[in-house]
Amino acid sequence: MELQDKLLIAMPNLQDSYFSQSVIYICEHNEQGAMGLVLNQVTDLSIAELVAKLNFMMADGRHYPETYVFAGGPVSMDRGFILHTATERTFEHSYRVTDNLQLTTSEDVIETFGTPEAPEKYLVALGCATWTSGQLEKEIADNDWLVVPANNHILFDVPWAECWTAAQQLLGFQPANLVAEAGYC
């Protein structure tokens, strides 16, 4: 099962306090496990505030979105992850997720924010979600997650508070109508 570049939508019955009603973009999936970013939990920090805290002395005239930094997951919460559209510029620590999306963990991408070199679309997250080999596949088989193809509209344009509902609409049915457990006659 190939899960890279997919969205995980938490089933309504998922009771985990961190992942209940979450939407996660899977950035990497291989035989070692999976890594993703939660798209609908935010910190109380805006991108502009993050840039200031990182002590970047940016040139005047740069404008930063008032977008909040996402709480990308419970792992490595002190580490930044920037998911962005591909650019002509190469960043120090970038991973190609798709032909059009990259995940960067180096500060050099932040230095481009507010300039023509900046990615057209991006989101900034602190922390990520990870799964060991086979763990995510088991959670999917246990009906914890629904899987749909990702799209840039959900990733970058839908407000975080509406993400779970918007992602569910990609399914073509309401997950609340599903039964969480199979029955036998």
Curated annotation (Swiss-Prot):
This is UPF0301 protein MS0260. GO terms for cellular component: cytosol. It comes from the Bacteria. It comes from Mannheimia succiniciproducens (strain KCTC 0769BP / MBEL55E). Belongs to the UPF0301 (AlgH) family. It holds the Pfam family DUF179. InterPro entries: AlgH-like. PANTHER family: UNCHARACTERIZED PROTEIN YQGE, UPF0301 PROTEIN YQGE.
